[in-house]
Amino acid sequence: MDRSEIVARENPVITQRVTNLLRTNAPLLFMPIDIHEVRYGAYMLFMYGSLENGYKAEVRIENIPVFFDVQIESDNTNQLFLKSLLAAENITYERLETLTQRPVMGYREKEKEFAPYIRIFFKSLYERRKAITYLNNMGYNTAADDTTCYYRMVSRELKLPLTTWIQLQHYSYEPRGLVHRFSVTPEDLVSYQDDGPTDHSIVMAYDIETYSPVKGTVPDPNQANDVVFMICMRIFWIHSTEPLASTCITMAPCKKSPEWTTIVCSSEKNLLLSFAEQFSRWAPDICTGFNDSRYDWPFIVEKSMQHGILEEVFNKMSLFWPQKLDTILKCYYVKEKRVKISAEKSIISSFLHTPGCLPIDVRNMCMQLYPKAEKTSLKAFLENCGLDSKVDLPYHLMWKYYETRDSEKMADVAYYCIIDAQRCQDLLVRHNVIPDRREVGILSYTSLYDCIYYAGGHKVCNMLIAYAIHDEYGRIACSTIARGKREHGKYPGAFVIDPVKGLEQDKPTTGLDFASLYPSLIMAYNFSPEKFVASRDEANSLMAKGESLHYVSFHFNNRLVEGWFVRHNNVPDKMGLYPKVLIDLLNKRTALKQELKKLGEKKECIHESHPGFKELQFRHAMVDAKQKALKIFMNTFYGEAGNNLSPFFLLPLAGGVTSSGQYNLKLVYNFVINKGYGIKYGDTDSLYITCPDSLYTEVTDAYLNSQKTTKHYEQLCHEKVLLSMKAMSTLCAEVNEYLRQDNGTSYLRMAYEEVLFPVCFTGKKKYYGIAHVNTPNFNTKELFIRGIDIIKQGQTKLTKTIGTRIMEESMKLRRPEDHRPPLIEIVKTVLKDAVVNMKQWNFEDFIQTDAWRPDKDNKAVQIFMSRMHARREQLKKHGAAATSQFAEPEPGERFSYVIVEKQVQFDIQGHRTDTTRKGDKMEYVSEAKAKNLPIDILFYINNYVLGLCARFINENEEFQPPGNVSNKDEYAQRRAKSYLQKFVQSIHPKDKSVIKQGIVHRQCYKYVHQEIKKKIGIFADLYKEFFNNTTNPIESFIQSTQFMIHYFDEEQKVNHSMKKMVEQHAALAGNPAGNPAGNPAGNPAGNPAGNPAGNPAGNPAGNPAGNPAGNPAGNPAGNPASNALMRAIFTQLITEEKKIVQALYNKGDEIHDLLTYIINNINYKIATFQTKQMLTFELSSTHVELLLKLNKTWLILVGIRVAKKHLHALLGLHNNEPPSKTFIQQAIEEECGSIKPSCYDFIS
């Protein structure tokens, strides 16, 4: 079923009426959704949307004039001069027109108010842009000079909003397939002023399912074997969540369902073509998915490219004329569109923008609505809205069903996919996304695409120009090109009165706020660029003529900036552009809020089953969307005025607004103080005020004369709040009258919002209390909290719970006669309970969130992601089936984690070696839960809770800094946190055990080292040097001793080879008795026990060093053959040593297991405070055998190395007589003495 058939089925009556109107060429209503321009050749504008009944329509606007304006002052006002300028650059134009307009920058007196401009008309945008660039470079001021999107200028000039109903008149009509094509001129388009009928534009929500044969990975469109195997689509009316039709396109057999049409394709290529075909049949106005701009669209486009069908797919989906592949990729595939989520965050989107259909990513919309959301999944946003959740189907099961081609199970996959698409529309409707954006577009004369993909400042700028260029606002000529030097610096700061920190339990505090301070200042002081006077001489001249001026001055980048603005004195004709626009917006919003209130009251009186309820609900949503749009513009107005990239930017205006805010808050401050009121705190646009004590004298005396029960005290507090409310109402009226007298207008006003009692101020912009708005409300369930970190994004439930407990406990009403614990006592009590009673906390209390931003230097997150990458790679090496649990989130996406406890580790000398870095302790929530990893509660307390707790108590006298400290708050906060850290250390049992464990470790090390030194002499020093230079004993020990680990089977062969070489050497040297045959290495025959280990290598006992027995010192070698043999022996020793090293390396795993076993036992015995007993272990026979062989091999290697030294000495002395003992025996005896090291001694 195609779109026309669906429309006829759903709206038969309206369809018949629209058909009749088309036959008679009568005026029709058209709702634009998407805009496309033909920028080459003659300019044309195409608008795509729907007619009243839902028919798809294309409106082509022809004969649109292409022009811009240029201001030419002094004698060069004639057209001939401009013609000569254009001719010099070979710029072709159609005609010139002279007109007068008011320049937007700088005040002009009435007789000089208008300046001459020349409007230049062109045949194409190319020539227009060329002329704008040339004249700007020449220094001329231009206006109506949009260079990116000309349709915005068309909309402004014609006063024709692009997001609401338009009436088509005098059109030419041509039906072509599903699309009703109209051709009109600008004069044939009329803005429809009423709300219009129900919009029947069509939204297509879709979702894709992908597959990869590599389990545990996210399918990648660049991988040939990764495929999209299913696409599900569902269409709706734009305002409804009831589906009109549904389709499932799949590559696997799928059981049919009455809820959707199933299309089975034989290949991925056919699936993509079927998707394009179905898209063209429905011709949706809006296409939406969840995160589709970051996954679905890039996947579809990339796969279409691989199959060579992107051109065909695009042209099927597009309502425009066919395009070539290079044009599609250049103009219609938006690869990197930066979408602003909040002031600090943007996200990159990619999508295929086919003419006639506007793509909307629901995830982006929800992130803009919830910029501080910790989870940004579809499931999370559905939960936030109270909507039905998505279907739960794990990916590994989905892929299994696809692999098995089970049609029953594939129906489950299709249902999962269809429901995901359904939930996208549910979210769009619930949040009123399209109507809200449309209202913004109506005000700003921008398209729906602009309202979705561009930031607020862009729309405010366009709205200002739309107001400015029309007669009722003075025909102000505005440029869209920012000019002048762009300076970066800070405007005057706000006026701040430091808070009186601490808990206030005796007197109510009332907040007095300016209503919309910056817009109010703009309206009051006539801040507008065309009302600005730059020079003092001109200002004096104007004042001499009776004009009233507002002077502004402030310091910016080390210089004085000053200026004057001509005041309006409440005369409408004197009001500037900015105040006029703001007043108009304010009046509109006030009227809408009044209407909204009435509609809300009606909604409460009508049941949902009433026939008129839906219409009432729709009307309520529309009015609410309009007032929200007005609020957005008013709130972002100053932001654009202070944006130095804006064409409206004026430094004296931007700084003048903030300095005027500072002035007025000081004015109110002094007025209130002189009235006898106290100030608890003040900042930017608000003051927190306490009434004079005399106000409460009567009620206080009544309490003191009562029985002073709890009930009497509650009554006293109740009456104090009522008295404060009454006094503040009077004070507020007096303040507003005082402001009116000072600035001469009623635009700048203050209002009191709430009375806080009790209340606690902990720092600038940080306070909490019980709020009383209309009546006293001591039984409230929610505290009034501002700036306290428990509501900070990413914060754990642990921190929120502890912070809430402290605040709730401190807000309890306590009589002066009772014990009123100071805040520090409350904090310590709550903190002690949190630390000592650990069992009260659940796993969920420790879950945190953070954002993954690869370009930001968030060290903890960077370390964590590096660990996860290494873990994924390790799993892949071992052929693990899944690594998705360690997957890296998308840039900008938030992820959940916990801080887990790492085993306390010490080096062999008792120094802690376990990491304290946060990034090394972070684990994904799923991983920590699956492995039941212990939470590092102390880390949370020290790093997240204590800072919050310190904020409550840092006003205490003991934490205050000396007088020469500049940042007193920071100093006090640091001291308070240090105090609480010591408090936690005193009550946390684990900290004590860790300290004791380190002491025991150091004692054990000292004892072990002494024992080893007794037994192996020189080896103890080598052992000590090794462990002093390592932070990981097991791994480093293995690396340093890999040459000691195998070659046991070859031991006898090595000994035999060495003995044979020595015998040959002795025979040639004429000393056959030098090496008793059969003497095994490692057991020197005839060597008495206790032979000193200090005997120099190569010097037989009793022989002078360097002088072999029987050979005079320095006697040259008398036998060249013997000399050569010694070299051969030396070479053989090196060869044998290399063989041992290589062979022993292969036994690494066995020795690793052994060392791990021993080290773990050491740690266990240290943890249980066993000292000398730790030297005894119960080892298996395998371990014992390995230790014995390791011991022997060590000795062999030592022998070889010492033998090399002997040979080197012999060669150096040209001595051909060998020592009296074998080299190996001599080495062992000299290096180890008569006491051979035991197995455990050696390993330790």
Swiss-Prot record:
SMART domains linked to this entry: POLBc
Start and end residues of each stretch annotated as Disordered: 1069-1118
Region feature 13 X 4 AA tandem repeats of A-G-N-P, mapped onto this chain: 1069-1120
Keywords: DNA replication, DNA-binding, DNA-directed DNA polymerase, Early protein, Nucleotidyltransferase, Repeat, Transferase, Viral DNA replication
Further comment: Consistent with its intracellular location, ASFV encodes its own replicative DNA polymerase and three base excision repair enzymes: a class II AP endonuclease, the repair polymerase Pol X, and an ATP-dependent DNA ligase.
Function: DNA-directed DNA polymerase involved in viral DNA replication.
Protein name (record): DNA polymerase beta
Species the sequence originates in: African swine fever virus (isolate Pig/Portugal/Lis 60/1960) (ASFV)
